[in-house]
From Swiss-Prot:
InterPro entries: Lysidine-tRNA-synth_C, Rossmann-like_a/b/a_fold, TilS/TtcA_N, tRNA_Ile_lys_synt, tRNA_Ile_lys_synt_N, tRNA_Ile_lys_synt_subst-bd. It catalyses: cytidine(34) in tRNA(Ile2) + L-lysine + ATP = lysidine(34) in tRNA(Ile2) + AMP + diphosphate + H(+). Belongs to the tRNA(Ile)-lysidine synthase family. GO terms for cellular component: cytoplasm. Its EC number is 6.3.4.19. One of its GO terms (biological process) is tRNA modification. It is found in: Cytoplasm. The N-terminal region contains the highly conserved SGGXDS motif, predicted to be a P-loop motif involved in ATP binding. The gene is tilS. Pfam families: ATP_bind_3, TilS, TilS_C. Ligates lysine onto the cytidine present at position 34 of the AUA codon-specific tRNA(Ile) that contains the anticodon CAU, in an ATP-dependent manner. Cytidine is converted to lysidine, thus changing the amino acid specificity of the tRNA from methionine to isoleucine. This is tRNA(Ile)-lysidine synthase. It is an enzyme of class 6 (ligase). SUPFAM superfamilies: Adenine nucleotide alpha hydrolases-like, MesJ substrate recognition domain-like, PheT/TilS domain.
Length: 456
């Protein structure tokens, strides 16, 4: 126990993090059982809070018993425990291992605050398995880097303080401390790749080469260092290729990050261009694409015909092109049929997380100084005020323009990306456009007695 608490403390101190809370990823297995003891002791010594999160996957008939047992152990240490129940769609085509892992980290995210540290119980044997799985998939240096000892996690951090410790060492410490733990029967199922490596591959390799674990971890560390160095050397190229949203619309874009200049990318070699796209996706917290997907991003999206509206679905987002820029866009609902009345001095909540519209009458001299506010007059209004998202067949005459045009053409002129054109609210007076929020006011409603603010 003494050497493990020293290892635990050393890793946290070397990370230079000063958490106000430790959150323990607590499955109840031997690794996390020892981790809980270490975290509770560290928290008590350093005067910080220690909490735990147990994820109930519902995959085992024993899952309820495990949750109850975890609660008992946490109570004995005065550690608060949150039990998160998740459901997995095991028929979606993804491996159960990946589904469970993704669900766990989504559950952990629900309990993380800024400045927290989530500690997890992975050890050197887990690192070896992760490396071999990446090798089996044909991963490059990034995948072969395996698990980092410290990594960002939203506004918090994940720390793996036992990554240099063997599974046998953890089990020996658990026995020395007189601990009990749960045994997940699925860990013996050789249909799962990680279990196959653990029970069939690793013993043979380590019997032949006793230091094989340490050698693999050294290779993983070297891969991580090379990746970090390459990112550092190419950061200036990425910054040159990155751009802000070129759209003049203030619409909520649902873009995950800045856009990427196709002109800038085209100046580089195939290898460098692919690397910059990977770096961009990494900055957007997206899983790394395969080589085939990278080629599709460039060939079928970036290099599509000028009049095309190309897109590529990548995981749960879309890669889109607009104004010779690549965008990462969240999958969104079709709001074409959505409409709602709105009253003066009332707020209207928009669908699909698009914020709300504040509409109010203003007297002379009391207008808002907020630059996002649009001012107009309703003295000529004679219809029902409503908000719609469907621009089909609708025309408007923006203030300062010589004539009216279809909204479809105006959206193009105002450089609104195609995926936002049915997500930009249109304020209507009956069948006439008063304003397109974030873009313009119609000439027929020019004035200062009313103002609208679209808060995203």
């Amino acid at each position: 126990m003494t050497h493990l608490i020293e290892t635990f403390t050393s890793v946290l101190h070397q990370s230079a993090l000063k958490p106000s809370r430790l959150i323990v990823a607590f499955s109840g297995g031997v690794d996390s059982r020892v981790l809980l003891e270490l975290a509770a002791q560290y928290a008590q010594t350093h005067g910080i809070e220690c909490c735990a999160v147990h994820v109930h996957h519902g995959l085992s008939k024993n899952a309820d018993l495990w949750a109850e047992q975890c609660q008992t152990w946490c109570d004995a240490l005065s550690v608060s425990l949150a039990v998160e129940r998740v459901s997995l769609d095991i028929n979606c085509g993804e491996s159960v291992e990946k589904l469970a892992r993704d669900a766990r980290y989504q559950a952990f995210q629900q309990h993380i605050r800024q400045g927290d540290v989530l500690v997890t119980g992975q050890h050197i044997d887990d690192q070896l398995e992760t490396f071999l799985l990446a090798l089996k998939r044909g991963s490059g240096p990034k995948g072969l880097s395996s698990m980092a000892k410290v990594m960002s996690f939203g506004e918090a951090f994940i720390v793996r303080p036992l990554l240099s410790v063997t599974r046998l060492d953890i089990e020996a410490s658990a026995h020395d401390m007189g601990l009990t733990w749960v045994e997940d029967e699925s860990n013996q199922d050789l249909r799962f790749d990680r279990n196959f490596i653990r029970h069939q591959v690793t013993p043979t390799l380590t019997e032949r080469w006793p230091s094989f674990r340490e050698s693999v971890c050294r290779s993983a560390q070297l891969c991580a260092e090379q990746e970090s160095l390459l990112d550092e050397l190419l950061e200036s190229h990425l910054q040159q290729a990155l751009g802000g949203c070129n759209s003049k619309s203030n619409s909520k874009s649902n873009s995950k990050s800045q856009s990427l200049s196709i002109d800038s990318l085209s100046q580089h070699s195939d290898l460098l261009r692919a690397r910059l796209i990977r770096m961009w996706l990494s900055h957007c917290n997206q899983p790394m694409p395969s080589q085939k997907q990278l080629k599709l991003i460039w060939d079928e999206v970036a290099c599509a015909q000028a009049d095309a509206n190309p897109k590529l679905v990548l995981n749960d987002v879309e890669i889109r092109r607009f104004n010779n820029q690549l965008y990462l866009v969240q999958d969104t609902k079709d709001l074409s049929s959505w409409k709602s009345e709105i009253l003066i001095d009332e707020n209207l909540l928009l669908p699909d997380g698009l914020g709300e519209i504040h509409l109010k009458a203003v007297s002379s001299g009391s207008a808002s100084h907020n630059r996002d506010v649009q001012r107009f007059s309703l003295t000529k209004a004679n219809g029902t005020l409503r908000v719609i998202f469907n621009p089909e067949g609708v025309s408007a005459h923006p203030v300062g323009r010589g004539h009216s045009r279809k909204l479809k053409k105006l959206f193009q002129e105002y450089q609104v990306p195609s995926w936002l054109r049915r997500r930009t609210p249109i304020l209507m007076d009956g069948d006439r456009v008063i304003a397109v929020l974030g873009l313009f006011v119609d000439k027929n409603y020019e004035g200062q007695d009313c103002e609208a603010l679209w808060s995203k």
